[in-house]
UniProtKB/Swiss-Prot annotation:
It comes from Mycoplasma pneumoniae (strain ATCC 29342 / M129 / Subtype 1) (Mycoplasmoides pneumoniae). Its EC number is 1.2.4.1. It comes from the Bacteria. GO terms for biological process: plasminogen activation; positive regulation of fibrinolysis. This is Pyruvate dehydrogenase E1 component subunit beta. Keywords: Oxidoreductase, Pyruvate, Thiamine pyrophosphate. Its cofactor is thiamine diphosphate. Heterodimer of an alpha and a beta chain.
């Protein structure tokens, strides 16, 4: 019987990075405070001491340089893991990620690849202003050549991260801060992967498909299995990968239920929820029994302190949308 460990999301992530560094000498890791301090959330705690400063090191506050160094290192044969402290700090790095990391394979006609992982803590959970609480997955998700991942539980966090390490192409790895230490889960202690691009069917039902990912999954699972949405025939899907997203799983579910609700913390306009609904409407219109709906964050700058509650607390609106769709 395989050995298992109890881990929360931050511990599962640290375990994955430890295994990656141990198995492959080409893996390197760096970021602001990622070395000596073990990262702002302590995801990399102890790794510099174990693997040395040549493989795990600290960087200045220079996200563009961090990403650019990673691109060059990846082209040169290393597998860099770059920690951006918060996803909102990644704006200076976008030029390097979008125009170089994502395009190297195409630009070189396959001669070079860019196996870089850019880690980005995202979303609410610490009641911090603006850049500390951004939800930017739609921006990264539309960039050809990038894979964009967002796990919601320790098992997927470890498995998806190790799959990202194996990817020959760049992966943006979003980490919901509010779930870092929200709960523990029994996961394999050994190396394993979860396929990038494959959604997870959490619950089966015949009345309504709910598609979500990342920080909203914890509350949705509790609502479906023991709360206000219990016994309502909900088919709950954890997307896990934003790009490429698993159309097949979502489409098969909507064909069965005829109803769709997409739930995300991100803003409503020009985001992932709209892409999913547009795709379903374009390709499955004849299957729909009701107009698809979405529950999202507001189209505003993330507010400070207690204001975060009004941006990211979606449960009452989820219940209202479900009742409307099931009328």
């Amino acid at each position: 019987m395989s050995k298992t460990i109890q881990a929360n999301n931050i511990e599962a992530l640290g375990n994955a990075m430890d295994l990656a560094l141990e198995r492959d000498p080409n893996v390197v890791l760096y970021g602001q405070d990622a070395g000596f301090e073990g990262g702002v959330f302590r995801a990399t705690k102890g790794l510099q001491k174990k693997y040395g400063e040549e493989r795990v090191w600290d960087c200045p506050i220079a996200e563009a340089a961090m990403a650019g160094i990673g691109v060059g290192a990846a082209i040169g044969g290393l597998k860099p893991i770059v920690e951006i402290q918060f996803s909102g700090f990644s704006f200076p790095a976008m030029f390097q990620i979008f125009t170089h990391a994502a395009r190297i394979r195409n630009r070189s006609r396959g001669v070079y690849t860019c196996p870089i992982i850019v880690r980005m803590p995202m979303g609410g959970g610490i009641k911090a202003l603006e850049h500390h609480s951004e939800t930017l997955e739609a921006i990264y998700g539309q960039i050809a050549g990038l894979k964009t991942v967002m796990p919601s539980n320790p098992y997927d966090t470890k498995g998806l991260f190790l799959a990202a390490v194996e990817s020959p192409d760049p992966v943006v790895f979003f980490e919901p801060k509010k779930l870092y230490r929200a709960f523990r889960q029994e996961i394999p202690a050994d190396y394993y992967t979860v396929p990038i691009g494959q959604a997870n069917l959490i619950s089966q039902g015949n009345n309504l498909t709910i598609v979500s990912y990342g920080p909203t999954m914890f509350d949705l699972i509790n609502m479906v299995y023991g709360g206000e949405l219990k016994d309502k025939g909900i088919e709950l899907i954890d997307l896990r990968t934003i790009s490429p997203w698993d159309k097949e799983t979502v489409f098969n579910s909507v064909k069965k239920t005829g109803r769709l609700l997409v739930v995300t913390e991100a803003a409503k306009t020009f985001t992932t929820s709209g892409e999913i609904i547009a795709s379903v409407t374009e390709e499955l219109f004849s299957y729909l029994k009701a107009a698809p709906q979405r529950v999202t964050g507001w189209d505003i700058v993330v507010p400070l302190a207690r204001g975060e509650h009004y941006q990211f607390n979606l449960n009452a609106r989820i219940l209202e949308a479900v009742n409307q769709l099931l009328k």
